[in-house]
Amino acid sequence: MKLLLDTHILLRAAAGTLARDAEKMVIDDKNTLYFSPVSIWEIGIKQSLGRSDFMVDPAILRRGLLDNHYQELPITSAHALAVNDLPRLHKDPFDRMLLAQAKAEGLSLLTADNILHQYPGPVLFVPAG
């Protein structure tokens, strides 16, 4: 399965605090794991705002993801346009872009976000941990 990990799941994976269901998916060699520059951007913004739950260095996280064979999914204008096709269930622009990317690329979005879980389509919900 091709999985795009949302920002929260990426942070938990990096910290080694994933819930068991999410951890099984992440360590399964049959799955291809993707991350988006959207998550790196979100972490950088929220870190600069002093959010204590985003205190990882985004450059170090990115390097660690690449070193652990995660695939970086570039953002395209097609992804930006796909955001407009999403129902207005969620106001978070980072999460909306992640979902648009997953839909456009045929990936499943792995998330612990209860609002993202309400969207139809390729969303896999796992408990936060």
How would you describe each model-predicted region?
Residues M1-F35, R51-R63, E105, N114, ...:
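Short, well-structured N-terminal submotif of metal-dependent ribonuclease cores
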Residues I9-L10, S39, H79, L98, ...:
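Alpha-helix capping/helix-boundary segments
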Residues L61-R88:
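Acidic catalytic patch
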Residues F94:
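Acidic donor-binding loop at a coil-to-helix junction in glycosyltransferase catalytic cores
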Residues M97-G129:
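Acidic, PIN/NYN-like endoribonuclease modules and their adjacent C-terminal/linker elements
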